[in-house]
Regions:
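Short, surface-exposed loop/turn segments at beta-strand-coil junctions that are enriched for proline
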Residues: 4-10
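Surface-exposed repetitive/solenoidal architectures
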Residues: 37-298
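A short beta-strand micro-motif common to beta-rich folds, especially ectodomain repeats
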Residues: 10-21
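C-terminal edge beta-strand
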Residues: 23-36
Length: 298
């Protein structure tokens, strides 16, 4: 006998009957074919997709299932992350050989194009006791030779505040979009998430806290026109901290970028901060806290 191909992939059921007319006997088997699980192809449409994409990047495995025909990772709609109780950033950082020119080494950074297509990643909460955690807290831990564009984090009605408690390890970076960006472009991105740093930053230990991007090397934030500019609309604030240093060992807090490293190519174009920046630290700025090398255009 022949069973026709299931072209729709829908669940279907049937009965197979075996009979012997000579002895007047028969037997039947009920069969059910479950619906085909369609693999996500061409973009990210659910929180599970985004979590699995992050795992793929962090494991160094293929991300092709989330790429469109142009090879971009794309959001197909707004993504609700309320079901995700513990987020692991996409990519990570190592600060073992920290210098002001090369602050971090990327670990499995995202290296392609991530196009939000104007959609939002909503209800992403990275609140944590950071005492014994990693160094990176954000959507991306690290990007390198990458483009991130047309992406919204949260929305105008968000009530989410990232509550960061404990004592921050040296070189911790907290930034909703990307903690560390090297040789990359970030354009057309907006953040609405708030950051409340109730943790302590120990004296003389560099930490970076930003409403959008933490630390950059040879990276452009904002495009070549106002339409491609980036903005932060969430507040960034800290309580009293032990670190009152004013310099490279101080706490860096800003609305757009906390630390522009001592390397050529850093640029901020058409960036705007609308969020309240309230931080009793040595290096605080509405746009950037420390600019060691680079340019800002508006």
């Amino acid at each position: 006998f022949t069973i026709l191909a299931n072209e729709t992939g829908d669940e279907r059921s049937g009965k197979i009957i075996f009979s012997n007319s000579l002895y007047n006997i028969s037997s039947s088997i009920d069969v059910i074919q479950e619906a085909k699980e369609v693999e996500a192809k061409g973009g990210i449409s659910t929180a599970a997709d985004l979590v699995n994409f992050a795992k793929a990047v962090n494991n160094g495995t293929s991300t092709s299932r989330w790429q469109n025909d142009a090879g971009e990772i794309v959001l197909l709609n707004d993504i609700d992350m309320s079901s995700v109780t513990s987020w692991t950033p996409i990519g990570d950082i190592d600060a073992s050989n920290y210098t002001t020119a090369e602050p971090y080494v990327s670990i499995h950074p995202f290296t392609g194009t991530f196009n939000g297509q104007g959609h939002a990643i909503k209800n992403l909460d990275c609140s944590a006791d950071i005492t014994n955690g990693g160094l990176a807290y954000g959507l991306f831990g690290s990007i390198e030779n990458a483009t991130v564009k047309n992406l919204v984090l949260g929305d105008a009605s968000t009530t989410i505040t990232w509550m960061m408690s404990g004592t921050a390890p040296k070189y911790t970076v907290i930034a909703p979009l990307a903690c560390f960006a090297k040789s990359s472009v970030i354009e057309g991105c907006t953040n609405y998430y708030n950051i409340d740093f109730t943790a302590d930053n120990k004296s003389g230990e560099f930490n970076a806290l930003s409403g959008l991007v933490g630390t950059i090397v040879n990276t452009t934030i904002g495009g070549e026109s106002k339409a491609q500019g980036c903005s932060n609309r969430g507040f960034v604030r800290t309580g009293r901290i032990s670190n009152t240093a004013n310099g490279g060992t101080g706490m860096q807090t800003a609305g757009i970028c906390a630390f522009m490293a001592k390397a050529e190519g850093g640029k901020l174009n058409y960036c705007t901060n609308y969020g309240d920046i309230s931080c009793p630290s040595g290096r605080t700025g509405g746009i950037v806290a420390t600019l060691m090398y680079g340019n800002i255009y508006n």
